[in-house]
């Protein structure tokens, strides 16, 4: 068993075993994690997919990147279903698309619902006022902390390649 695990890791790119991804190794390329953050910051709104008892559910949210911590933050409402869904199943998916530049980004990772009025104030944007007229101190404000594990990137109009790398490694570095 150890030999097959070692072989799987050896064959994988950025610590992601090929056998799990089921994508030929020839299409993998390393990209700097900064490219992921650049795309998220430019696109801003991503589709967050969570799990619930009936399957998957996606909704748009405005992202805030914390490059130093290697995480993505979202401001959310405690009254929404996503907080309950994340409380049960932390695994999530994020999708960002810049159609004009032909850039498509898919991120998988883990999400955590956090109540932290200080952090909410730090990352608050004017657009959040539309959802929370009382501002960052609104008692319904919650934060989603997304810890990305893997990012897949289709970058540019002629890109047939999927660029995969391990965000968790960059967070630990």
Roles of regions detected by a PLM:
Residues 53-56, 101-103, 154:
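Short glycine/serine/proline-enriched coil/turn segments at secondary-structure junctions
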Residues 31-33, 79-82, 125-129:
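Charged, amphipathic alpha-helical segments
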Residues 37-53, 91-96:
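A short, Trp-centered hydrophobic/proline-enriched beta-strand micro-motif
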Residues 2-28, 107-173:
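Charged, gly/pro-rich active-site loop segments
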Residues 58-60:
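Positively charged, polar, low-complexity stretches
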């Amino acid at each position: 068993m150890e030999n097959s695990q070692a072989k799987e890791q050896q064959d994988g790119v950025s610590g992601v075993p090929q056998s799990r991804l089921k994508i030929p190794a020839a299409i993998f390329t390393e990209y700097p994690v900064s490219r992921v953050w650049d795309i998220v910051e430019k696109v801003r709104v991503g589709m967050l997919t969570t799990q619930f008892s009936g399957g998957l559910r996606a909704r748009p949210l405005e992202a805030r990147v914390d490059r130093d911590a290697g995480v993505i933050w979202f401001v959310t409402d405690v009254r929404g279903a996503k907080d309950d869904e994340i409380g049960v199943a932390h695994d999530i998916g994020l999708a960002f698309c810049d159609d004009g530049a032909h850039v498509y980004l898919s991120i998988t990772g883990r999400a955590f619902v956090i109540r932290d009025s200080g952090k909410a104030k730090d990352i608050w944007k004017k657009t959040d006022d539309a959802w929370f007229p009382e501002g960052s101190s609104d008692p319904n404000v919650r934060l989603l902390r997304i810890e990305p594990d893997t990012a897949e990137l289709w970058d540019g109009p002629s890109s047939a390649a999927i660029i995969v790398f391990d965000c968790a490694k960059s967070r630990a570095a």
